[in-house]
């Protein structure tokens, strides 16, 4: 690591001191570029600054690992993608860490080799243990939480859906924070023709802890990736056959992140995936090769989420709810 950029340079210097990385500290991206101390950069700034910082860096010749999303809006994503296609087509790798998760990669391998037959439904859940923090700026629970789930399903299937809709609720944690967000619980549906359904469930209300689970349903069985555990030091992937089968078709255990006290809860689940993602980025930069993900992957995920948002309904919006 050659440099750390943060407007709070004191905080950046404390990080450099704790980590022992010896990086230089800069107070702005402009200062970093002027110093000419590196040629590859990871951007983890607020969404509103993603495009601005990415543009500055790629123009300066940097290759960039950009945390999702591209810009936060469908129109902005389309415009930025068109610009990158014209001027810097291989400069940006979008940070979809689930593609580098060993458990999900194994599940994808099982699916592609026909272990559970033809897959007709994929369910992906992401549940936070609490609300977004006070002062956090959210564009909505679907854009904020579901983008990784959506990309996971697109990556697993290699397809784009043709229809989407969503349902949202405000049932608990929205009252515990000053963060203004449309819903604290939502379900996004996406249809791939008439033969495949994707379901994404996101919530801020899983008070017992961080929950990440995916299930692939096939004509000959199902694959389960992960189960909730308050101490997620292992991720189990299991493939089951049809009813009546006595043994699992496949089973493999992968290490969790072991983030420890004070670490964000998602590090416990995806710590190894984040590490591998960064390794792949650096390998591609060193070799001058193409990245495994691009800005176009970010646009595709945003297109699905935007379609769901356009059809997003809550009870107050007149969603069809039958009285009992």
Annotated model-derived regions:
Residues 1-18:
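NAD(P)-binding Rossmann-fold cofactor-contacting core
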Residues 40-43, 78, 266-267, 280-324:
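C-terminal helix-rich "cap/oligomerization" subdomain common to oxidoreductases
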Residues 48, 71-134:
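A contiguous active-site-proximal alpha/beta segment in oxidoreductase catalytic domains
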Residues 178-181, 194-276, 294:
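NAD(P)-dinucleotide binding in Rossmann-like oxidoreductases
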């Amino acid at each position: 690591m050659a440099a750390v950029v943060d407007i709070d340079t004191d905080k950046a210097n404390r990080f450099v001191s704790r980590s022992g990385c010896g990086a230089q500290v800069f107070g702005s991206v402009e200062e970093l570029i002027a110093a000419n101390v590196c040629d590859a950069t990871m951007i983890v700034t607020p969404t509103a600054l993603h495009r601005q910082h990415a543009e500055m860096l790629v123009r300066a010749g940097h290759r960039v690992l950009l945390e999702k999303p591209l810009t936060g809006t469908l129109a902005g994503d389309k415009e930025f993608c068109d610009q990158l296609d014209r001027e810097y087509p291989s400069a940006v790798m979008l940070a979809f860490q689930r593609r580098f998760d060993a458990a999900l990669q194994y599940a994808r391998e099982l699916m592609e080799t026909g272990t559970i037959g033809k897959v007709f439904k994929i369910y992906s859940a992401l549940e936070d243990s609490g609300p977004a923090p006070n002062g956090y700026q959210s564009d909505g629970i679907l854009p904020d939480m579901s983008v990784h789930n959506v990309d996971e399903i697109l990556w697993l299937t290699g397809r784009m859906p043709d229809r989407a809709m969503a349902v949202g609720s405000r049932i608990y944690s929205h009252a515990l924070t000053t963060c203004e967000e449309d819903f604290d619980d939502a379900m996004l549906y996406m249809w791939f023709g008439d033969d495949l359904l994707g379901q994404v469930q996101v919530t801020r209300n899983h008070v017992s802890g961080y929950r990440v689970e995916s299930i692939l349903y096939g004509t000959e069985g199902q694959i389960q990736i992960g189960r909730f555990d308050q101490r997620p030091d292992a991720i189990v992937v299991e493939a089951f056959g049809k009813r009546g089968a006595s043994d699992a078709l496949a089973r493999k255990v992968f290490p969790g992140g072991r983030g420890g006290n004070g670490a964000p809860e998602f590090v416990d689940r995806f710590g190894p995936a984040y590490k591998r993602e960064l390794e792949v980025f650096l390998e591609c930069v060193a070799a001058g090769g193409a990245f495994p993900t691009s800005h176009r992957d970010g646009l595709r995920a945003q297109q699905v989420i935007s379609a769901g948002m356009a059809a997003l309904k809550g009870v107050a919006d007149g969603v069809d709810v039958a009285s009992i």
